[in-house]
């Protein structure tokens, strides 16, 4: 069987908007990674860039299950200051976009396409975003019956 390669005319990059209010971080990152790779399209090919643009709004209202909010640590050594460790609660106040971006980045493939796909991810703290002229489609994430705390 021959490898399917979509033609350049078949590669359309649609726009989706996801509301992150009370959505569990892992479920949000999984769905965003699927949309960024273009796996929701019938013309998907792993070697071709058929991904979509994803806008995530209300990033500051993301939910984490269990007691990860205080226990989990996000560490980054940006040099010259050295190692810096923040809990998710502190990082959610300062920079919630960074939490979501790193979760989505971990779910993308580790290759050259990942950078291009990650560049199509746009995360905003509030409900407003400047991409209304692109007419993004609303993407609903199905929630499990358990409540996120």
Curated annotation (Swiss-Prot):
Question: What organism does this protein naturally occur in?
Answer: Bifidobacterium longum (strain NCC 2705)
Q: Which residues cross the membrane?
A: none
Q: Name one GO cellular component term.
A: cytosolic large ribosomal subunit
> What is the designated name of this protein?
Large ribosomal subunit protein uL13
Keyword Electron transport present in the record's keywords: the answer is no
Gene symbol of the encoding locus: rplM
Assembly and interaction partners: Part of the 50S ribosomal subunit.
Q: GO molecular function: any one?
A: mRNA binding
Stated role: This protein is one of the early assembly proteins of the 50S ribosomal subunit, although it is not seen to bind rRNA by itself. It is important during the early stages of 50S assembly.
């Amino acid at each position: 069987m021959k490898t399917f390669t979509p033609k350049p005319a078949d590669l359309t990059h649609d726009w989706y908007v996801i509301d992150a209010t009370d959505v569990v971080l892992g479920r949000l990152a999984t769905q965003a990674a699927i949309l960024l790779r273009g796996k929701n399209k019938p013309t998907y090919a792993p070697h071709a860039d058929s991904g979509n643009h994803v806008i995530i709004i209300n990033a500051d209202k993301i939910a984490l299950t269990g007691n990860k909010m205080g226990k989990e640590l996000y560490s980054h050594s940006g040099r010259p200051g050295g190692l810096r460790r923040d809990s998710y609660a502190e990082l959610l106040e300062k920079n919630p976009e960074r939490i979501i971006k790193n979760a989505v980045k971990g779910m993308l493939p580790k290759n050259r396409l990942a950078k291009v796909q990650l560049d199509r991810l746009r995360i905003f703290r509030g409900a407003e975003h400047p991409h209304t002229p692109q007419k993004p489609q609303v993407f609903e994430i199905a929630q499990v019956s358990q409540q996120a705390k």
